[in-house]
Amino acid sequence: VVMDTDGALDVKGIPTDSNIVYDLHLHTNLISFPFAGFASVEETIPEDTQSSIDAILGEGAAALNNHDTGEWYGGLEYLEGTKGYWFITNEEVSFSYNPPVEGAARQDSPIRSVPMEFAFRQSTQQAFYFVNSATIGGEPLDKEDIIIVYNGDVIVGSRYWYGETTDVP
């Protein structure tokens, strides 16, 4: 919509059918999560579909599928209603989300906000680094350590270490 004068725009939304079938093609697909609230990645994506998905990217968080163990790693543990996600697939696949379980308690995200001096501007071309382990002075990282990514002297990503396979945008 382009308006060249002051005016009012009245938009009426129609809820998405929760049984919508998403037809994903090979590689990158931008899709929505059609439910209110939150649902865990492992529970809302049908089990027989998960092997076709390598990763899911959200705003500032990612989930990486370990096909050997069937586990998801990274800070994106829950899909959130009204948000969009990039699904990275290794083959064409069609699926419908499993609806969230009523009354299911959402656990806190492992992602903590970093101090302002380590903040960065979110990019439309964001990438993620998945860090399995790291040391400082020969000592393993702990939950108070921050991983910082630079491009020259500009901070382009940062994340508190939260354990194995920390995603750093």
Where are these regions (language model features)?
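N-terminal exported-region signature
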Residues: 1-142, 146-169
